[in-house]
Amino acid sequence: MDIFLRSISGILVILGMILVGFVIGEKGWFDDKSRGLLAKLVTQVALPCYMLYTITQRFTAADLLKMLPALRFPALSMVILLGIATGVARIFAVRQDRRGLFISMFFNSNTIFVGLPINQALFGDASIPYVLIYYMCNTTFFWTLGTYLIQRDGEGEAQFDLKTSLKKVFSPPLMGFLLGLVMVMLQIKLPAFLASDLQYLGNLTTPLSMIFIGLSVSHVGVKQLVLGKDQLLILLGRFLVAPLLMASIVYWLPLPSLMKQVFIIQSAMPVMTNAPVVARLYGADSDYAAVMVTETTLATMVVIPFLMLLMA
């Protein structure tokens, strides 16, 4: 019960910040352009600083070398989820013009905008390396296979562009993580003033991310949130199939309990915030993607405490 109450407390912290974003969104403080600016501040400024500061200040080379082989667990989970999603889309006759988007949302999760703050709230900073390991896998899958599938919905015969995909995979947050990794391995220390700058900027990550989520919920509108077949299947995939699959992969293995818990929580995160953006770019069903981002984000706040209780 103590774990359940602690997880409820962590979720309430997150919900409070989301509520702030929702309220100012309803008041019309942010238009599409300013929402995009907020997302850029998080992904291109706050998150890279957060990654670089956290890795260089809190981990040793030995710590990181022990963790990197764990990449195989989220990778295996996502490959299996991709197969399951493809089968589910065919069995339940998901519309052809949104099938690729459906598959992408089924097997990819929002590991940074939502995953990082939630894991921090539940487990503290010790969870960050495991969060980043899952993120590395997730972002690679989304900007390669996921984007290809969404593009196929909008353009029919999609073409895979390796150069564009690599630019997306090696995003500023991942580059911040990799730079931190190199500095730790080479035992390069940050000057104190620079470390402080990175810490201040990095601390913007969680509040700005949650305010952005609240703004997104306001933008979609509560009236748009419906539970049709295609919506329910995504909810089941994100919050039942994905965590059960990850749990079945890691449960029996001699891994740190924190790693297992973080991987399971990360697998049960909502649909990626980038999904509607990519869908709009390629002429796919961006409204469906936006609704699913909102519905799964709200559902996460209910699901996570019960997941924590089960893992205890």
Feature locations, PLM:
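Alpha-helical transmembrane segments of multi-pass small-molecule/ion transporters
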Residues: M1-A312
